[in-house]
């Protein structure tokens, strides 16, 4: 019974790490990759 709980814990940990790395990678891709050309800087567009 203890092995099953440990296995579930590791599976959940691996899933959480995978999701975290996936979201981080997607954010970096969006910020610095090809989609970044479509991003607009509101501070540069705003005239004082």
From Swiss-Prot:
Belongs to the PsbN family. One of its GO terms (cellular component) is plasma membrane-derived thylakoid membrane. Keywords: Membrane, Thylakoid, Transmembrane, Transmembrane helix. It is a single-pass membrane protein. Its main location: membrane. One of its GO terms (biological process) is photosynthesis. HAMAP family: PSII_PsbN. May play a role in photosystem I and II biogenesis. The lineage of its organism: Bacteria, Bacillati, Cyanobacteriota, Cyanophyceae, Synechococcales. This is Protein PsbN. The chain crosses the membrane at residues 12-34. The keyword Thylakoid applies. It comes from Prochlorococcus marinus (strain MIT 9313). The keyword Disulfide bond does not apply. It is found in: Cellular thylakoid membrane. InterPro entries: PSII_PsbN (IPR003398).
């Amino acid at each position: 019974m203890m092995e099953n709980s440990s296995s579930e814990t590791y599976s959940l940990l691996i899933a959480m790490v995978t999701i975290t790395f996936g979201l981080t990678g997607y954010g970096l891709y969006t910020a610095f990759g090809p989609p970044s050309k479509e991003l607009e800087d509101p501070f540069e567009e705003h005239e004082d």
